[in-house]
Amino acid sequence: KKLAVIGVTGTEGKSSTVSFIWQFLRLCGKKAGFISTVQYSTGGDAVANPEHTTTPEAPVIQKYLYQMAENGCEYAVIETSSHGLSEKLNRTGCIDFDCGVFMNVTLEHLEFHGSFEQYRMDKANLFRKLDENNHEKTILGKKVSVPSFGVVNLEDESASYFIASTKQPVLGFTT
């Protein structure tokens, strides 16, 4: 409730996209942190992620988000894996996402999800979560209404599935 939170999901390209968004926010003069497989930042420079886990366990994520808020961040960008979004593990269950970014989905992690449909459904939980809160937050001590929206790779065959998974506006992109 103290950060505008952007989640990024997809089979490939999550870490790069998280890094790009984080760097873009910083170039725009916004203080931001991020969590990805490779690195993380709680408001300062990026450091190596010692766990090398795409979406860490919920207590680790909450610790980083708390540190970001304490360090004066306005934004958090989180790499969100299908495992982390799955209701089985519920690693992201307590996060109020304001923006969801969908990169792509291909056949992967079927041993965990059991089917492609379940894999895609778990990834789309990011977009469903956009509808779960009112996006009223207190950022840097100020009450703000954070715009909520999705961003979808229109070249992916599952784009329409992700668009239909939220009531929020969705922007599309192509490469």
PLM features: residue spans?
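Switch II of P-loop NTPase G domains
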Residues: 83-93
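Residue-level signal for inorganic ion chemistry
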Residues: 8, 15, 35, 61, ...
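Gly-rich Lys/Arg/Thr-decorated short loops/hinges at beta-loop-alpha junctions or inter-strand turns
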Residues: 38-48, 98-107
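Conserved nucleotide-sensing/catalytic segment adjacent to the nucleotide-binding pocket
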Residues: 46-81
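Short, basic phosphate-binding NTP loop
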Residues: 1-9, 16-29
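Hydrophobic anchor at the start of a short beta-strand
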Residues: 32, 75-76, 169-170
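Short beta-strand-centered segment that lines the nucleotide-binding/catalytic pocket of NTP-utilizing
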Residues: 29-42, 81
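Acidic, Mg2+-coordinating active-site environments of NTP-dependent enzymes
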Residues: 70-71, 87, 96-175
